[in-house]
Amino acid sequence: TCSNKGQQCGDDSDCCWHLCCVNNKCAHLILLCNL
């Protein structure tokens, strides 16, 4: 199981190459991330 920044993302566990987790989904657009 691979998670982005050590964070589980709902049903998406393969978040290595994503910026963050939004609405239990991996997000790859910085605009979708809450900074």
Swiss-Prot record:
The keyword Secreted applies. The keyword Secreted applies. InterPro entries: Conotoxin-I_CS. GO terms for molecular function: ion channel regulator activity; toxin activity. It comes from the Eukaryota. Keywords: Disulfide bond, Ion channel impairing toxin, Neurotoxin, Secreted, Toxin. Disulfide bonds join 2-16, 9-21, 15-26, 20-33. Belongs to the conotoxin I1 superfamily. This is Conotoxin M11.2. It comes from Conus magus (Magical cone).
